């Protein structure tokens, strides 16, 4: 405890929030955690901690009485949390990650009270980062432990009730964690202090934790409420560019994914591209996550495919996208359907299945383009003039290509419907002359963006 109090004193004198946050970390060597736990007992912990904090700040500007009490409550809660954490780490009998979570939640509540009414200053907000981040980790551990116990038939911790639904409590602690993080979000957002000493500087870290939590709970839509609230307060906020790049990247990634899930692909591409450009060159996992959504976005917004060079550093993305890309490029409809089917589980898991399914339109466009090119040229109507591509294509030729490509026999009406859809989506320029059984294509740019 003496070592911890000394670090607290140094952090207070230098106003170093990150050094202060390390005194609340559970990620210390077990030997160090054990030493903190054994430094006092239940009967004297409160007095030992309070006396240590009072004495530690006597050499410089003394902390106000309320703030001393606030930090004493925080470190008492931390000491109690260590008492639950050590048995859980050692898998001792009667230990429980639920107990760890509940004790750590008390630590976060003590910090919250410190900022609300005991004078904690904004420079110390990294303490919120460390405690909030680990609250989420302990929530995941507690839910995992509980679900494993239920699967093993141990229901001793459950209250028996007729309508008990095991699935409703699978993420019980993580859902509670989301509520605690929301309190911290509001704590930062509603700070009315001048910006240079405002808790608003902690808001994007907490927002990013909330995004991760909501996505883990499969409640991504709740993230939109955060964005709406943030938008309403944006005039009172520091610009995003003033925050650490790591926080900018994470925020832009989730903002892009949310737009992606709402099928707002142009905005999604904009946010994801910003995240990609800000991402550190060696953060390969983060870049892979960004590309998971940026590649399908780009496919729909620009009708272009990822290059082999782009995907080369990411074997998992190659496995995901290259089979589909090859089928789209060659206009192979049946092979595209098979590749989509084979990767369905992974695509659904990553929430990109429906978007990639639309890539079939690009494959169909490339197939129809082949028919157009194979049609060759017509002699110019002007003597000596250059030959021009045949632009009046019989529907039957397109029908034959589509039937061969998809390995399905389609009726003429279905073919015409597909063609009309391509024209409507501006993947092909022209019109259908039904009476004559022709598709009349534009003489300039029959297939926009393809150079034909």
Swiss-Prot record:
InterPro entries, per database record: Csn12-like (IPR045114), PCI_dom (IPR000717), WH-like_DNA-bd_sf (IPR036388)
PROSITE patterns associated with the record: PCI (PS50250)
Pfam families from the UniProt entry: PCI
Superkingdom is Eukaryota
Q: Report the residue ranges that make up the PCI domain in this protein.
A: 249-446
Q: Where are the transmembrane segments?
A: none
What family name appears in the similarity comment? Belongs to the CSN12 family.
* The protein's name in its UniProt record: Protein CSN12 homolog
Native organism is Neurospora crassa (strain ATCC 24698 / 74-OR23-1A / CBS 708.71 / DSM 1257 / FGSC 987)
């Amino acid at each position: 405890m003496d070592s911890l109090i000394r670090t607290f004193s140094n952090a207070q004198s230098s106003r170093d929030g990150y050094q202060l946050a390390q005194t609340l970390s559970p990620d210390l060597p077990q030997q160090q955690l054990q030493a903190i736990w054994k430094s006092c007992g239940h009967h004297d912990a409160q007095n030992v901690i309070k006396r240590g904090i009072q004495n530690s700040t006597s050499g410089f500007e003394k902390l106000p009485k309320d703030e001393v009490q606030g930090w004493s409550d925080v470190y008492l809660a931390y000491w109690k949390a260590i008492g639950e954490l050590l048995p859980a780490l050692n898998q001792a009998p009667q230990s429980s990650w639920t107990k760890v979570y509940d004790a750590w939640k008390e630590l976060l509540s003590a910090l919250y009270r410190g900022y609300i009414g005991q004078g904690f200053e904004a420079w110390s907000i990294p303490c919120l980062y460390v405690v909030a981040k680990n609250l989420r980790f302990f929530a995941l551990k507690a839910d995992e432990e509980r679900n494993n116990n239920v699967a093993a038939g141990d229901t001793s911790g459950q209250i028996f009730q007729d309508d008990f639904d095991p699935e409703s409590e699978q993420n019980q602690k993580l859902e509670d964690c989301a509520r605690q993080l929301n309190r911290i979000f509001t704590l930062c957002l509603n700070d009315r202090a001048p910006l240079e000493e405002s808790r608003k500087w902690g808001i994007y870290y907490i927002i990013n934790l909330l995004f991760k939590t909501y996505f883990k709970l499969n409640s991504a839509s709740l993230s939109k409420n955060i964005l709406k609230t943030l938008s309403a307060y944006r005039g009172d906020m520091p610009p995003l560019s003033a925050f650490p790049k790591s926080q900018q990247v994470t925020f832009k990634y989730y903002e892009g994914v949310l737009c992606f899930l709402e099928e707002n692909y142009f905005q999604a591409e904009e946010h994801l591209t910003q995240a990609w450009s800000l991402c550190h060159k060696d953060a390969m996992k983060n870049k892979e996550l960004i590309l998971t959504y940026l590649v399908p976005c780009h496919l729909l917004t620009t009708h272009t495919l990822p290059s082999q060079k782009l995907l080369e550093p990411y074997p998992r993305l190659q496995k995901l996208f290259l089979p589909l890309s090859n089928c789209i490029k060659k206009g192979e409809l049946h092979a595209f359907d098979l590749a989509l089917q084979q990767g369905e589980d992974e695509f659904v898991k990553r929430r990109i299945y429906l978007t990639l399914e639309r890539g079939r339109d690009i494959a169909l466009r490339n197939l129809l383009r082949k028919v157009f090119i194979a049609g060759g040229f017509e002699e110019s109507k002007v003597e000596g003039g250059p030959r021009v591509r045949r632009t009046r294509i019989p529907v039957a030729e397109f029908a034959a290509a589509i039937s061969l490509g998809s390995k399905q026999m389609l009726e003429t009406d279905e073919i015409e419907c597909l063609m009309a859809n391509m024209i409507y989506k501006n993947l092909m320029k022209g019109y259908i002359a039904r009476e004559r059984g022709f598709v009349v294509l534009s003489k300039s740019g029959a297939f926009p963006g393809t150079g034909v």
